């Protein structure tokens, strides 16, 4: 029988637009997502497939927030050490693999910024911010904006899974 192969060379055009297209397509499908019913956002193409390290980090974050299957289609022999570190971020992968299996919902969109909220097992939540604008941006994350009631007995702790920073 024949053996099928695929080409892992870098494409001539940037590929992050396809990541954003898949992300946008999958957002309204979250209501169908649960263990046993996974929305397939497509392959992880980061690392050597015509994407920057920042775009690779964004794709892994988005796919993890969507509880998507994490299937890498990049050429493993050509991944930089930085790309391997990004794609192997255990904390971000744990968000994807959380046993609750729920997909994030879009809680805020504006000025090129999306804020996603994903319920996790144990009553925790993951929050991700996507800058799909053309330059640097910032967003103020207030509990009410993220869907949390402003109560005195509510205590919030935040961890940056990419930078390691912690804030209470």
Language-model region placement:
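Glycan-recognition surfaces
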Residues: 1-75
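Helix N-terminus capping/helix-initiation residues
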Residues: 40, 52, 80, 89, ...
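Catalytic cores of secreted or luminal carbohydrate-active enzymes
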Residues: 58-108
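Carbohydrate-binding surface patches
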Residues: 63-66, 71-73, 109-150
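Solvent-exposed beta-hairpin/edge-strand motifs
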Residues: 144-164
């Amino acid at each position: 029988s024949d053996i099928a192969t695929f080409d892992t060379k870098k494409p001539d055009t940037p590929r992050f637009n396809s990541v954003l297209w898949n992300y946008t397509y999958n957002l309204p499908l979250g209501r169908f997502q649960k263990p046993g019913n996974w929305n397939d956002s497509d392959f992880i193409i980061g690392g050597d497939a015509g994407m920057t390290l920042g775009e690779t980090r964004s794709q892994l974050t988005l796919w993890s927030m969507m509880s998507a299957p994490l299937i890498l289609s990049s050429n493993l022999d050509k991944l930089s050490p930085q790309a391997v570190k990004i794609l192997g971020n255990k904390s971000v992968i744990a968000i994807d693999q959380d046993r609750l299996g729920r997909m994030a919902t879009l809680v805020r969109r504006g000025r090129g910024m999306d804020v996603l909220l994903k319920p996790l097992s144990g009553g925790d939540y993951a929050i991700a911010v996507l800058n799909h604008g053309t330059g640097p941006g910032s967003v103020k994350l207030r509990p009410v904006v993220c869907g949390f009631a402003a109560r005195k007995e509510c205590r919030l702790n935040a961890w940056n899974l990419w930078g390691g920073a912690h804030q209470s």
